[in-house]
């Protein structure tokens, strides 16, 4: 095999590779002989088919197979012998494919950069932390109690007020004709509550028990029933009972109803849940600070195609948000060229940080264990109730899908390693300070 380097520009490399015709013929003959051993044709005993007939019948398909095998093996050998580390699958272009002559093809690839790791021990960070206050725990308990409210009759005679619940019968009509799904009996409706079409529950305010009222509403344009979307409708409402939502007293009995031994145990669990939420924010903030610090020390060149692929993924989301008028406030008012330039910088930063973290992990032996992958697969499967086994089967049958789980786990383990090596000082602050003016949504 003869290899000639044709391009060496930054991380880009190009080669012309020639494989002798004798090597090709040896492979082809060997493959045809393997076929002949098992080939069964009428008039011939198994394994006794003449080679000329084998070539006539299977020569073309064997040539294709041998060519693909030769190119792949030659490319892998060239990459290995030269100690190259491709960032992506090499691009191959066939130049001469006549198997009776030397096969010639071109290989283009982009290399992973040589990365000099920063002194992780010199990285200094402040990790903001917060602890749940008694007030935060009380508020969380009140929210739990609100979700456990019971409806009780209102004893006084008065019209329905905002926040009350009316038990009603109703009949809905469009163009004077009742429509399917527009009739209800003994339904409890919260006055000005959510979950109804606009104006439905709001117009029940002021109704008294025994009173009937006709209200006019318009179904939203995006309503789930196409026949009703955007159409005006009338509902005849009859009020049958007035109720109010009463939250339970937060005491030991309340905790017992939730399956716990005491209010003290409930407070303990709620406190830990809040602490976990605070710790997640703390983790995201210190991770962002760490990545900012590493980015300042990551001045190496990055493979252009990796950046382009990352940018295309980002831009697909940004462009959809732009067209739907969902851009962040910071991006509104920017023209497309400016947005593209901004997000290309983000893409380059992400690729650079990803390569740096990967190299830190490689050099320091960070690995993702099978038990971690299994936990991740189970966690992903739990997001699809009733389809858990199908999700697990999908992962087992698709190694690339498993790799999509491996990447985030690996990244977090490398971050953990760096945080253990770096100088990290913990600073306790209020939850308001922990949450203040900080984008912790990603690594960009």
Curated annotation (Swiss-Prot):
User: Can you cite an annotated GO cellular component?
Assistant: cytoplasm
Q: Which InterPro entries match?
A: PPIase_dom_sf, PPIase_FKBP_dom, Trig_fac, Trigger_fac_C, Trigger_fac_C_sf, Trigger_fac_ribosome-bd_bac, Trigger_fac_ribosome-bd_sf, Trigger_fact/SurA_dom_sf
Subcellular location per the Swiss-Prot or TrEMBL entry: Cytoplasm
Enzyme nomenclature, EC number: 5.2.1.8
**Residue ranges annotated for the PPIase FKBP-type domain, each copy included:** 163-248
Q: Using the UniProt record, name the top-level EC class of this enzyme in a single word.
A: isomerase
The principal localisation class reads cytoplasm
UniProt keywords, alphabetically: Cell cycle, Cell division, Chaperone, Cytoplasm, Isomerase, Rotamase
User: What PANTHER family does its record include?
Assistant: TRIGGER FACTOR CHAPERONE AND PEPTIDYL-PROLYL CIS/TRANS ISOMERASE, TRIGGER FACTOR-LIKE PROTEIN TIG, CHLOROPLASTIC
Q: Which family does it belong to?
A: Belongs to the FKBP-type PPIase family. Tig subfamily.
Q: What is this protein called?
A: Trigger factor
The beginning of the lineage is: Bacteria, Pseudomonadati, Pseudomonadota, Alphaproteobacteria, Acetobacterales
């Amino acid at each position: 095999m003869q290899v000639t380097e044709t391009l060496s520009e930054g991380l880009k490399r190009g080669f012309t590779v020639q494989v002798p015709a004798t090597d090709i013929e040896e492979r082809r003959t060997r493959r045809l002989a393997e076929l002949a051993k098992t080939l069964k044709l009428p008039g011939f005993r198994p394994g006794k088919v003449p080679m000329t007939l084998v070539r006539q019948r299977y020569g073309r398909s064997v040539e294709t197979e041998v060519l693909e095998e030769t190119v792949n093996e030659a490319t892998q050998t060239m990459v290995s012998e030269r100690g190259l580390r491709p960032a992506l699958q090499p691009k191959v272009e066939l130049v001469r494919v006549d198997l009776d002559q030397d096969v010639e093809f071109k290989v283009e690839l982009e290399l992973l950069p040589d990365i000099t790791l920063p002194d992780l021990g010199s990285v200094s960070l402040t990790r903001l932390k917060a602890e749940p206050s008694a007030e935060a725990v009380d508020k969380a308990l009140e929210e739990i109690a609100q979700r456990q409210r019971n409806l009780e009759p209102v004893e006084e005679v008065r019209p329905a007020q905002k926040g009350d619940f009316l038990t009603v019968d109703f009949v809905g009509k469009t163009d004077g004709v009742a429509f399917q799904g527009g009739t209800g009996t003994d339904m409890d409706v919260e006055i000005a509550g959510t979950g109804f079409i606009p104006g439905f529950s709001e117009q029940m305010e002021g109704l008294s028990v025994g009173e009937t009222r006709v209200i006019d509403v318009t179904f939203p344009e995006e309503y789930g029933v196409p026949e009703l979307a955007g159409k005006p409708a009338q509902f005849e409402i009859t009020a049958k009972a007035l109720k109010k939502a009463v939250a339970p007293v937060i005491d030991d009995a309340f905790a017992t109803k939730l399956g716990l031994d005491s209010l003290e145990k409930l407070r303990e669990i709620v406190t830990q849940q809040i602490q976990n939420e605070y710790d997640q924010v703390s983790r995201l903030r210190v991770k962002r600070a760490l990545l900012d610090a590493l980015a300042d020390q990551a001045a190496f060149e990055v493979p252009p195609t990796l950046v382009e692929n990352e940018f295309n993924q980002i831009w697909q989301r940004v462009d959809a948000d732009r067209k739907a008028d969902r851009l962040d406030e910071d991006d509104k008012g920017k023209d497309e060229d400016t947005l593209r330039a901004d997000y290309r910088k983000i893409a380059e930063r992400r690729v650079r940080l990803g390569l740096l973290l990967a190299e830190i992990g490689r050099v320091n032996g960070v690995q993702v264990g099978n038990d971690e992958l299994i936990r991740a697969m189970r966690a992903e499967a739990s997001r699809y109730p009733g389809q858990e086994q199908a999700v697990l089967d999908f992962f087992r049958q698709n190694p690339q899908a498993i790799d999509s789980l491996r990447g985030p786990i690996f990244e977090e383990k490398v971050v953990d390693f760096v945080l253990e090596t770096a100088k990290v000082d913990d600073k306790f602050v209020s939850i308001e300070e922990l949450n203040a003016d900080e984008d912790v949504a990603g690594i960009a």
